[in-house]
């Protein structure tokens, strides 16, 4: 299986499977001289790790990241400085229960990658889905922690804005609320609604989809290039690479199709300091594939988890009709833990374009 690497100058390769002994990543192209501590990476993995509420999988993983290369340790024994060589990171798997998947070893779960993996490669890791499992994304979050260090002054934050048909009230948006509830919701009022709704989904052994919004602030103007190297193109590509993602939009996205040209175009005025001021941000901070200096806004839709307790019609590897019912521990709404994953992907895209711009134009330091 090829294509386990993304990025141009800031390149990330992930490896490992859901039920293997460990998984991890190699970050190549990280500039030398970046100083950080392990806790600067661990904080993002802690947001993503399973078992933190009844609304996510009860698989218990500490997701403790280890940095194996690419850094030098300071005298304090904690602070690391990047050397410019590949940064390799490892996360051990400690709570696999492969026996839960014995009954579906030759069955294809509807909506899952089981069938297509077997079709393409003639073999698949049925234990938790192998590489197709969202477990793989822990390594991406670790890489995103490094990416956040690359671009000075950039803040990347995400939030869950919709579960099923239940959407947040954007008038209640408060970033301080995001880490105060199990859903990463910026709207405190929607939390009890989601709790009741997901409790019903969970008890029925079913699952539901969600929408996540990621906003990057402090992005320098001028990142990205026309046509085949657009910043929004690469953000969309990386978000689409996340397991279970079925749609991505930048700025107003699909809503722009219902908007007039007068309302959609972001009007501009010159500020007192000589810096242009945008009067709105329908473009999501990107015009012509190049960042405007406004916040970069992306949303992505995550489908319902395919592994559910409800019995469904399918086939097996022998071509027989079967009824599939998945046991094991699964997310009733995988979109919850997709919030830090989406943040990581946007951070990696911005870091890559920052380094590419610096190398091509020399205008950024």
Swiss-Prot record:
Binding-site list for FMN: 131-133, 243-244, 288, 303-307, 329
This entry's comment on the bound cofactor is:
Reduced FMN (FMNH(2)).
Domain of life according to the entry: Bacteria
UniProt catalytic activity = 5-O-(1-carboxyvinyl)-3-phosphoshikimate = chorismate + phosphate
| Any Pfam family matching the protein | Chorismate_synt
**Biological processes, Gene Ontology terms:** amino acid biosynthetic process; aromatic amino acid family biosynthetic process; chorismate biosynthetic process
- Its quaternary structure? Homotetramer.
Family that this chain belongs to: Belongs to the chorismate synthase family.
What name has this protein been given in UniProt?
Answer: Chorismate synthase
| Source species of the chain | Rhizobium etli (strain ATCC 51251 / DSM 11541 / JCM 21823 / NBRC 15573 / CFN 42)
Q: What lineage, starting at the top, does this entry show?
A: Bacteria, Pseudomonadati, Pseudomonadota, Alphaproteobacteria, Hyphomicrobiales
This chain is encoded by the gene named aroC
